[in-house]
């Protein structure tokens, strides 16, 4: 893994910082694990914008990732590591002993030729998946389930991980990267290690067009709009002088957005404390 700063041969290249990984496969992905991915442009079935700043971008295939890790007690060998345009993490193509191939999230330290396994009695080794009741307290894990058998939902992006800090009865207590501590059923599975490609955060796109390649459209400030378009709009010169709100008048910047009382009891400590 190398951080490469581009030479300033043009204004668009001047600030570009790339993350180069020579370990990644340079050929095509495994065709049987690809699915179609159609663009929405941020519109719903009525054609109305439901998510702003989405549109365009390069065509992509979706890679079918095994988040459930439910091929139990069947050893597999990592064939290669690959780039995935749909996520910040890299992925690994695994060939299992029964001949099936699956993509998994590539943890830090995993390389082509490594053996991995999933199951209650799998060894504590990077890339292996097992129920958290069998993982030692203090271990670093990723791709953590919230419900047994549903598949990993926590710690899936590049460089992310969760630490198991306690085990009491049927629950384990996890410390998330945000600082939040929450309880999860000990039967839920997790994968040992942290997600690889942690240098992803160091990359610099360098120009607006690089964001457009990724399907991200410009974000216009509310103060630059007319009063008809945004509560912050209008006025001669730069006028603001009010509490910041969304284009629909809902308070923002500090307003609580969590509305799931049902699972509040599982949060031991809120994030940022």
UniProtKB/Swiss-Prot annotation:
This is Large ribosomal subunit protein uL2. One of its GO terms (molecular function) is structural constituent of ribosome. Part of the 50S ribosomal subunit. Forms a bridge to the 30S subunit in the 70S ribosome. One of the primary rRNA binding proteins. Required for association of the 30S and 50S subunits to form the 70S ribosome, for tRNA binding and peptide bond formation. It has been suggested to have peptidyltransferase activity; this is somewhat controversial. Makes several contacts with the 16S rRNA in the 70S ribosome. Keywords: Ribonucleoprotein, Ribosomal protein, RNA-binding, rRNA-binding. It comes from the Bacteria. Residues 221-262 are annotated as: Disordered. Pfam families: Ribosomal_L2 (PF00181), Ribosomal_L2_C (PF03947). One of its GO terms (biological process) is cytoplasmic translation. Coiled coil: none annotated. SMART domains: Ribosomal_L2, Ribosomal_L2_C. Residues 253-262 have a biased composition (Basic residues). Belongs to the universal ribosomal protein uL2 family. HAMAP family: Ribosomal_uL2_B. One of its GO terms (cellular component) is large ribosomal subunit.
